[in-house]
Amino acid sequence: MSKTHLTEKKFSDFALYPPIVEVLDSKGFNNCTPIQALTLPTTLAGKDVAGQAQTGTGKTLAFLTATFHHLLTHPAAEGRQTNQPRALIMAPTRELAVQIHSDAEPLAQATGLKMGLAYGGDGYDKQLKVLEAGVDILVGTTGRLIDYTKQNYVNMSAIQVVVLDEADRMFDLGFIKDIRWLFRRMPAAAGRLNMLFSATLSYRVRELAFEHMNNAEYVEVEPLQKTGHRIQEELFYPSNEEKMRLLQTLIEEEWPDRCIIFANTKHRCEDIWGHLAADGHRVGLLTGDVSQKRRLRILEKFTQGALDILVATDVAARGLHIPSVTHVFNYDLPDDCEDYVHRIGRTGRAGESGCSISLACEEYALNLTAIESYIGHQIPVSKYNSDALLTDLPAPKRLTRRRSGAPRHNRKRPG
């Protein structure tokens, strides 16, 4: 981590439950990020907080630290049953829920608190088996949580801590009714520690906090610019005919260690995947049509370095912390300005630098004006020589012929 990303405040400065400090220290977390330094004094005192911070700022560790400390320093409800978790962490997507659960595992192992997962699309019986054994902290998405609650596999009446992560995304995906349904089955707000985190503290997010939290303190961590000052942005204007060749040429020139390519539709993502896989790249595909088991395998391979490139729709643009992503390519400029910020926020995280390259083609160039207005600056434009683009590229693979990719082969440019 870069020192400029951290504050002078140390985790050891707080009166944290000792095993928590030991885990943080073993993982190299000594100094707090701004969102951690600003929220922990409030949450560790048992007071509610609504925090605004972009992804990659350390908010997950902020609420996990507070959650574990609170449970370890406060007794469970008297007469608590096996199906009654003590803490509930709600996330908008299953990928984010899995990520939070993974981040919490070292703390769980060190403290003896039991973790559970509840998300749709996969593993119903496997998740249920863990819940039936009893969990202290339950991480999940609203649909599966409601399912388990309605069948009395989970009872929310002994909840002591509630975390709502990516609250603005919850609104975008239409989950707010589900969240309110779950809140109504918990103890009153005054009897819980409530934490909410969001990329924006809009009126609707503040209204949610007012309804279901107890005089929450609002904490805002604004970046120097919405896109992050460690991200180098670049923009090209390709024709539709040259767009794919330009992408492949840029990948060849940049040779990114680990990159994510975003496109606006699953069909476009499949097309990109086919071209790159045929060209020998170690590339994975992440869209809504990919099964949950395969999505998790792809993310694991990408995180561990078995894949160099991930082609994705915006399903992967929020919440996922994949370390050391060096490049983000916007093959299509997004229709939603916020999606641009969230996409390129996959790189330049936790004090690292990153590179974002966008292609403003004939189809999506009209989105650029709104994006630049939203981020508050113009994206630097670069030019390319059409004659220098790669030409002897293989025909794209069909999606049904998924393979991990063969060794890259040498190519020549014309001239």
From Swiss-Prot:
Its main location: cytoplasm. It holds the Pfam family Helicase_C. The keyword Ribonucleoprotein does not apply. Keywords: ATP-binding, Cytoplasm, Helicase, Hydrolase, Nucleotide-binding, RNA-binding. Its EC number is 3.6.4.13. Residues 245-390 form the Helicase C-terminal domain. Residues 396-415 are annotated as: Disordered. Belongs to the DEAD box helicase family. RhlB subfamily. This is ATP-dependent RNA helicase RhlB. It is an enzyme of class 3 (hydrolase). InterPro entries: DEAD/DEAH_box_helicase_dom, DEAD_box_RNA_helicase, Helicase_ATP-bd, Helicase_C-like, P-loop_NTPase, RNA-helicase_DEAD-box_CS, RNA_helicase_ATP-dep_RhlB, RNA_helicase_DEAD_Q_motif. ATP binds at residues 53-60. DEAD-box RNA helicase involved in RNA degradation. Has RNA-dependent ATPase activity and unwinds double-stranded RNA. GO terms for cellular component: cytosol. A motif (DEAD box) lies at residues 165-168. It comes from Sodalis glossinidius (strain morsitans). GO terms for molecular function: ATP binding; ATP hydrolysis activity; RNA binding; RNA helicase activity. Residues 40-219 form the Helicase ATP-binding domain. One of its GO terms (biological process) is RNA catabolic process. A motif (Q motif) lies at residues 9-37. It catalyses: ATP + H2O = ADP + phosphate + H(+). Component of the RNA degradosome, which is a multiprotein complex involved in RNA processing and mRNA degradation. It is found in: Cytoplasm. Residues 398-415 have a biased composition (Basic residues).
